[in-house]
Amino acid sequence: MTGMVTERRSVHFIAEALTENCREIFERRRHVLVGISPFNSRFSEDYIYRLIGWAKAQFKSVSVLLAGHEAANLLEALGTPRGKAERKVRKEVSRNRRFAERALVAHGGDPKAIHTFSDFIDNKAYQLLRQEVEHAFFEQPHFRHACLDMSREAIIGRARGVSLMMEEVSEDMLNLAVEYVIAELPFFIGAPDILEVEETLLAYHRPWKLGEKISNHEFSICMRPNQGYLIVQEMAQMLSEKRITSEG
């Protein structure tokens, strides 16, 4: 594709805050961190354009969060050789970045405000938050099981996306793929410290079971007071999913 499509249809998004504190952060609309997943057909160029357009209209400042190199673990867990998995992730994240940059430029945002998990490996705030997550993972069985459950869902979802039949998900597969979950969690509990912003909301298109448990104080780790989570869904997609559910 050589250039941006100049005409886009009007679209509406519905935003739902995870907690009352998240709602209060949303009302102030200072900053949002838009999460974009790799290997997810939802995140087409048009969808990213619409989503970032909505975010830019709602918030004073918009940043975008893309996957890091840990995404290769998910592919490797499904049998892709490590080198090939890393190449596929680099290609996919580059595609996501390109679409996000175009959308930010088109809507008057900052095209440099795009980050991957891996960008913060040497960031002190990220390191501390990740250490907190890893400590809970190894010391609290119920938290570890919740993380591995998310890992299982990701493996099954990716397998379904490539029409791969999964008879079972082994422990080795889970332990390999869970690195992605661990790498992402610091942005769920304390992204403002990492990004050096006053407060933010991590925005994604669906509820996060692990995040709901964290917000319900089921584990030692918790969301910082200036951190929130926002479920952002496109009206057209919601109506389509509702129609499929009612017909099915």
Curated annotation (Swiss-Prot):
Protein name in UniProt: Cyclo(L-leucyl-L-leucyl) synthase
Function field: Involved in the biosynthesis of pulcherrimin, a red extracellular pigment. It uses activated amino acids in the form of aminoacyl-tRNAs (aa-tRNAs) as substrates to catalyze the ATP-independent formation of cyclodipeptides which are intermediates in diketopiperazine (DKP) biosynthetic pathways. Catalyzes the formation of cyclo(L-Leu-L-Leu) (cLL) from L-leucyl-tRNA(Leu). Can also incorporate various nonpolar residues, such as L-phenylalanine, L-leucine and methionine, into cyclodipeptides.
Organism: Bacillus subtilis (strain 168)
Single GO MF descriptor: aminoacyltransferase activity
Annotated positions for site Could be involved in aa-tRNA binding: 88, 98
Quaternary context: Monomer.
Annotated site (Could have a critical role in the catalytic mechanism): 40, 184
Lineage of origin: Bacteria, Bacillati, Bacillota, Bacilli, Bacillales
Protein family: Belongs to the CDPS family.
Example GO biological process: pigment biosynthetic process
E.C. designation(s): 2.3.2.22
Catalytic site: 37
Residues under site feature: Could be involved in aa-tRNA binding(Leu) binding: 180
